[in-house]
Regions:
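Active-site phosphate/pyrophosphate-binding segments
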Residues: 1-26, 124-195, 200-205, 213, ...
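Active-site cofactor/cluster-binding pocket
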Residues: 66-67, 82, 86-97, 172-184, ...
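A structural-propensity feature for long, helix-poor, extended segments
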Residues: 72-91, 211-249, 353, 363, ...
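Short acidic, glycine/serine/threonine-rich loops at helix termini
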Residues: 43-45, 69-71, 94-98, 127-132, ...
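Ferredoxin-type iron-sulfur electron-transfer modules and their immediate structural context
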Residues: 336-337, 349-500, 508-722, 773, ...
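Thiamine diphosphate
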Residues: 3-152, 160-264, 267-317, 578-584, 588-594, ...
Length: 921
């Protein structure tokens, strides 16, 4: 039946599909059996080997179940001597993988049956290239081919991998391959999608595009892989041997091997602030040597400066796309320019005529590139020596190669000891990406030591440091006399980590400066001029100890920032509205914090290999983090709390047994009773734990109760359980679980990072999306009001609820988080978080200011509901925001593309929608 319908499809489409299709030499002696997209890469390898006279072939399986032995055997050449069966799965409990076992079964008992071996490929999303297929055919030519092999990895533990063959270009005739290295949200990927459409729609060429990303949000690594050819493209893998490479971020020259695989006589385009001799001076020797060895033509352009002159901010994509068409000549330049401008209207028309005209200018200025003279003497340059460091071996041998996009080259042995998925904390600190165009410069003269800059920083890359006399001796930078009696005789400095900063500018925006001096203490400067600050950061972070023990970090905003952030350098977007809240919680409670994280933006920037932003303090204490799904993150966190309670109950039982014992020393009984009395108080349990741990460690070999307490010593200090998720998880998919957990009455803290859309998946509408806003699945503006999650939660009467916006009231944010954590029951904190999906016209460098505007105009309200006050006879509800300036409400909406687009596309309906939105606010 299936065969019959496949024949019908062939008549309609012209594409022939059989149950099993053979490709290769009629008299093939070595044959691969496979199914899926890997068969296209295999066809390229087979063509290559057949051109050299080798007798090879492949059977592509199109109908696997039910498996027809009759049709399969009919497809296999009678001349076959050895067969390799490729499976994209691993069956540890079986004698082989499914397709391999089926093929063996077909030949079981057959006379002169071929030798059959099986192998695995493509697991963990590994690319499978023709060179790997060549290794399989090479294996089949051996007198005793390796069975149960793997390709695409280096297995130096169980030794199943086949030797990797060198990558070679096997695309069709006239194939042009290109790679573009970009920065997430710089528009590179979008521009390349348009390039493929332009070439595909205006020429007879076949086109293909693959896009690879790291796990970071905007500001992360992207690589676009494009192919254009005169014949159908069968390359089902990323580009390994490009004719053209564009590097849109000059910092990548030192971070990634951007020239790897670039063909002889190829072209290279670099977006850089350097010119001529200065550029040649700053290029790594390895890169210059490659240019000379392979006769590469090198072009450069300062697209960053051009974009700023035009008014496009950091959006260099259109300029560089124009340069690509001009350099490569893939299609006539005039046609490319004409089509690019058509796509600009299509892509940006909704954002207004001004945006369209700016992008038109970007197209025209894409021709301002220059050619760099490649010195033939570069061929003899030595590689730069590797910088010495004292970092852990795990960082140098695993984390850094993965960060350099070389993770696929790591051998299996590199992952010994972390097979269960456990990952080291604090690995984000070793990235030092240096991808910001501008970073803040501290002007000590104008600093009033308020620490507001550190408070709002999304990446914890600007911090206050207080130096004692000894620490000051080694400091090679300017400091101020520290303000505050507790810092008597000490000095103060705001230090920027320029290599981890993403350059959003929120710190400079919130800086009040010194009214007497008339200027801000922070101004945004070019990264290049601030690179010497990297050494100052290194000194402060390594040699200046935390002074948080000298202040009450929960007392006010300033004090909170003397606490070391235990959430730092995450992969969040530049200007992210979410991470300042997560960072603040880690500063206040991080040494005893446990986090159950919903899947979404917060899970991606919090725990993606290899960079983990959750880290530890000087004592090795830090948050314990785990990720669950959208739909059960609250239940997951509740499970953590209940498990913690159970383990602490065992500790308490052991202590009570010891207290009742006649042989237990008095000082032990006293310490145990102190813990029992204060176990539910963070400070008291911490103080008791410091006494108890050395006591039980000393006695655990002689006392069973002490042994039990020692076994669970990490649970002596009261945990601060946080459940973190976005509005998609909290308002929508996981709402049932959230409701169940707050109804349980257990002592958990839920933080809702409310961006009012599904941020991680591209801005789809959620129940948190406000009336009138454009989002995916609400293209003409949402027609129903936002769900009032906070007020719903207050109906229980025993749930602490707060609605906060850091940029509007920093002190209220701190107070609400502090109260929520201290409340002995369920708490829900809903935090307003501007997002790139909102389309802030002022840019994400104004995300904190946007929060302030939202509250001032009445779009977002600040309030707290504390049931503990009711027990004191007080009103549990407290409205913290002032009377709104309703006259500013419509202007606020117009400042965000998600609302402004509605007015542009649906002017007649927009007025009514916005009026209703204001009324419901």
């Amino acid at each position: 039946i299936v065969e019959e319908y496949m024949n019908e499809i062939s008549k309609i489409t012209g594409r022939k599909y059989g149950l099993f299709d053979y490709y290769g030499a009629e008299d093939a002696e070595r044959v691969i059996i496979a199914m899926g997209s890997v068969t296209e890469a295999a066809r390229e390898a087979i063509d290559y080997l057949m051109s050299k006279g080798e007798k090879v072939g492949m059977v592509a399986v199109h109908l696997y179940r039910p498996f027809s032995a009759k049709h399969f055997l009919a497809a296999v050449p009678k001349t076959v001597k050895t067969i390799a069966v490729l499976d994209r799965t691993k069956e540890p409990g079986a004698n082989g993988e499914p397709l391999y076992l089926d093929v063996k079964d077909c030949f079981y008992g057959a006379e002169n049956a071929p030798v059959i071996v099986g192998g695995r490929y493509g697991l963990g999303s590994k690319d499978t290239t023709p060179s790997q297929i060549l290794a399989v055919f090479k294996n089949l030519s051996l007198p005793m081919p390796k069975n149960h092999f793997t390709i695409g990895i280096v297995d130096d533990v169980t030794f199943t991998s086949l030797p990797q063959e060198a990558e070679i270009a096997l695309g069709g005739e006239g194939m042009f391959e290109a790679k573009f290295y970009g920065l997430g949200a710089d528009g590179t990927v979008g521009a390349n999608k348009n390039s493929v459409k332009i070439i595909g729609d205006n020429t007879d060429k076949h086109c293909q595009a693959y896009f690879s990303y790291d796990s970071k949000k905007s500001g992360g690594f992207t690589c676009s892989h494009l192919r254009f050819g005169d014949t159908p493209i069968r390359s089902t893998y990323l580009v390994n041997t490009p004719n053209f490479v564009a590097c849109h971020v000059q910092a990548y020259l030192h971070m990634y091997d951007v020239t790897r695989g670039l063909r002889d006589n190829g072209s290279f385009l670099l977006n850089t602030i350097w010119e001529g001799e200065e550029l040649a001076k700053n290029l790594p020797n390895k890169v210059k040597k490659y240019f000379a060895q392979h006769n590469i033509t090198v072009y450069y352009i300062n697209a960053t400066q051009i974009a700023q002159e035009i008014g496009l901010g950091n959006r260099t994509n259109t300029i560089l796309q124009s340069a690509f068409f001009r350099i490569t000549g893939v299609i006539p330049v005039d046609l490319a320019v004409e089509q690019m401008k058509k796509f600009i209207v299509k892509s940006y028309g909704k954002k207004g005529e001004d945006v369209v005209n700016k992008n038109y200018a970007a197209v025209d200025r894409g021709g301002e590139y220059k050619q760099l003279t490649v010195d033939p003497a570069w061929v003899n340059l030595p590689d730069e020596p590797k910088a010495e460091n004292n970092d852990p071996a795990f960082i140098n041998e695993v984390v850094r190669p993965i960060n350099a996009q070389d993770g696929d080259l790591l051998p299996v042995s590199a992952f010994k000891g972390i097979e269960d998925g456990t990952w080291h904390q604090g690995t984000a600190q070793y990235e030092k990406r240096g991808v910001a165009a501008f970073v803040p410069e501290w002007n000590a003269e104008n600093c009033i030591q308020c620490n507001k800059c550190a408070y709002v920083c999304p990446h914890a890359s600007i911090r206050p440091f207080v130096l004692d006399a000894e620490e000051q001796k080694g400091a090679q930078f300017e400091t101020l006399k520290a303000v505050g009696k507790q810092f008597d005789g000490m000095t103060f400095r705001i230090q920027v980590d320029v290599l981890d900063c993403l350059g959003c500018g929120n710190c400079a925006d919130v800086c009040p400066g010194n009214p007497k001096k008339g200027g801000k203490a922070l101004t945004m400067k070019h990264l290049e001029g601030q690179l010497p600050q990297a050494a100052n950061w290194e000194y402060c972070s390594k040699n200046v100890k935390s002074k948080q023990h000298l202040v009450d970090i929960k007392a006010n905003v300033k004090n909170s920032q003397f606490a070391t952030p235990l959430f730092e350098f995450s992969g969040a977007c530049s200007g992210c509205g979410e991470t300042p809240y997560v960072k603040l919680i880690s500063q206040l409670f991080g040494d005893r914090e446990m986090v159950a994280n919903a899947t979404g933006c917060s899970s991606i920037y919090s725990g993606s290999v290899p960079s983990t932003p959750y880290t530890t303090n000087e004592k090795g204490q830090g948050p314990a983090w785990a990720n669950s799904l959208f739909e059960d993150f609250c239940e997951f966190g509740l499970g953590m709390t209940l498990a913690d309670k159970k383990l602490r109950a065992r500790i308490e039982a052991a202590m009570k047994n010891a207290i009742a014992s006649d042989t237990c020393p008095a000082e032990y009984k006293e310490a145990f009773q102190e813990w029992i009395d204060g176990k539910d108080d963070a400070d008291k349990s911490k103080a008791a734990a410091e006494k108890i741990i050395p006591m039980v460690e000393a006695a655990k070999d002689k006392c069973e109760n002490c042994a039990t307490i020692a076994e669970f010593k990490n649970y002596l200090v009261k945990k601060s359980q946080w459940i973190i998720g976005g509005d998609g998880a909290s308002y929508d998919i996981g709402y049932g679980g959230l409701d169940h957990v707050i109804a349980s009455g257990e002592d958990v803290n839920i933080l809702v990072l409310d961006t009012e859309v599904y941020s991680n998946t591209g801005g789809q509408s959620s129940k948190a999306t406000p009336l009138g806003a454009i989002a995916k699945f609400a293209a003409s503006g949402k027609r129903v009001r936002k769900k009032d999650l906070g007020m719903i939660a207050t109906t229980y009467g025993y749930v602490y609820v707060a609605q906060i916006a850091m940029g509007a009231d920093q002190a209220q944010t701190l107070k609400a988080i502090r109260e929520a954590e201290a409340y002995p029951g369920p708490s829900l904190v809903i935090a307003y978080a501007p997002c790139i999906n909102h389309g802030l016209k002022a840019g994400m460098g104004k995300s904190q200011a946007e929060e302030a505007k939202a509250v001032e105009c009445g779009y977002w309200h600040l309030w707290r509901f504390n049931p503990a006050l009711e027990e004191e006879g007080k009103n549990p509800f407290m409205l913290d925001s002032k009377e709104p300036k309703w006259e500013e409400f419509q202007d606020y909406l117009k400042g965000e593309v998600r609302f402004a687009s509605v007015a542009k596309q649906y002017p007649a309906e927009a007025a009514d929608l916005f009026a209703a939105c204001e009324e419901m606010a």
